[in-house]
Amino acid sequence: MNELELKYGCNPNQKPARIFMRDGSDLPLTVLNGKPGYINFLDALNAWQLVRELKEATGLPAAASFKHVSPAGAAVGNPLRDVERQMYFVEEGADLSPIACAYIRARGADRLCSYGDWAALSDVCDAATARYLKYEVSDGIIAPGYTDEALEILKTKKKGNYNVVQIDPDYVPAPQEYKDAFGVTFQQGRNNFEINEALLTNLVTENKDLPEAAKRDMIVALITLKYTQSNSVCYVKDGQAIGVGAGQQSRIHCTRLAGTKADTWWLRHHPKVLGLQFVENIRRPDRDNAIDVYLSDEYEDVLAEGIWQKTFAVRPDPLTAEEKKTWITALTGVTCGSDAFFPFGDNVERARKSGVQYIVEPGGSIRDDHVIETCLLYTSPSPR
């Protein structure tokens, strides 16, 4: 099959719509269930490239959670700690494979933004991954294959309409790509730039100690950013993107946005959050929304009398500003990556507030010296 008709394009008024191969060859993908749309396929194909490259670069199973053509999260398949199982609503005693851990961690970076996501897996989707996805609100999944059991589980989602796409893992796209804007065709070579440890040798700070875990996290950050709408900044810890600031017109706004998301991710570890007692049969999205509001300055929106009873079995005490500040200061070992240079040292200052100890960015600003001087104040390595 060399083309696939779509219901509509980016918007419902944009018809007709289709995906096809310019050279007339067969599409490198097969729809196993559902009827994916235009944005679904954009998410799927971008997410697949991300997880494929992440697997190649780290040697670990990788997963991504995509929304609106940018990753809400990405991660490699490190085992989940007990606190993470609790945070991410993993069923007690669930036996998790590495690829299941990768997706749970990818989705767990920003569960609010991952609502209705497109999942991408570097490896065959197994039953453990499918069982976790079964209870999450998701639009679809792309993977190089599915076990029979996993496919049957996924086909039960969305009343049988869950989108399941299988990609040919051996497919190599043409070296040139095209895009039309206002009737004008743009042509460019594909972004085949390889991200690996060889890029991490130019340490501009006095501290030259770059642990292997930090190198891995830098690679996770850079590959995640490669498939994020620019401008973008990504915070990573333990092989997991914990905050992605995508598509902002100011670099510092990217850094702040990603930092705020990283802070929220870390605050979800707080005993008060882990101890929240929800009403029976509450849906996962409602829990996620309640936690997000509980952690915000508008916490009274879920704690006010007559309101909290809809969500909580017991009214929780607020997490005070001082408690949040104290908890966030305990976050360490975070890596911050940027898809372009930091123009000012304020990005470094903001990143430090969210536990960043390692920064990776390409450099090239006329104020590089100022950015490096700011890094030197904190002595952590900063490769370029």
Task: Identify the meaning behind each predicted range.
Residues 233, 242-257, 261, 328-377:
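Conserved structured catalytic cores and adjacent interaction surfaces
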